Amino acid sequence: THHPSSAASDVYKRQVLNAPMLKSTDGGKSFKRIRVPHGDNHGLWIDPNDNQRMINANDGGANISFNGGKSWSTQKNQPTAQFYRVITDNRFPYYVYAGQQDNSSVAVPSRTNGRGIDWSDWYRAAGCESAYIAFDPNDPVDLYGGCYQGLIEKLNIVTRKSRSIMAYEYLGLGSLPSDQKFRFNWNAPIFASPH
């Protein structure tokens, strides 16, 4: 979806939010891309008293600009994510695993040594944004994570080596259903056998 917004002080300026953020200074006749820290932009607040101050809401969190979008604040100072589903292991402290909307999957400790949990405590888990994640909850070394279109990744968190273990190696994006040997749901479930 496109969400146009404009600065109250200039009727010719328009911003359009989508995967990219676009800006027009001629009433929408032409647009140029505005660099933002994360894609899939969903909301933009422009200060009615100072159109150089903006807050952009996106799939990675929120970013602030004080110069009309020429530069933006970081996302590494906020615990924001949109999780599809969550699973935990049995360690102490336990870890929370989840696929993040339009981002990677992550493993996050439930606590740290007194300084709070920040991005340096997280690590990438297997799979992608739509991930179901499976592992041995008592020994979560090998992670299995899903992604859209039937993609499955096996990731060893000790060696950080990963490989695709998809049932049928084929990326179906952009192909006709009649040309596909198998069809997959957006996010097919993956479970670890208890045996």
Residue ranges and their predicted role:
Residues P109-R115, N156-R163:
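Short loop/turn segments immediately following beta-strands, especially the blade-tip
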Residues S130, S178-F191:
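Signature of short aromatic-glycine-proline-rich micro-motifs recurring in repeat-based ectodomains
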Residues K32-R35, T74-K76, I117-S120, S162-Y170:
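Beta-propeller fold detector
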Residues T1-A8, Y12:
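Single conserved hydrophobic/aromatic residue that forms the stacking wall/gate
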Residues S5, S24-T25, S65-F66, V108, ...:
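Conserved Ser/Thr-centered positions that define the repeating blades of beta-propeller domains
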Residues D10, N51-Q52, P93-Y94, P140-V141:
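Short coil/turn segments that connect the beta-strands within blades of beta-propeller domains
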Residues W45, I87, A126, A134-D136, ...:
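Conserved beta-strand position repeated across blades of beta-propeller domains
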Residues I165-F182:
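Surface-exposed loop and turn segments in beta-propeller and other repeat-based domains
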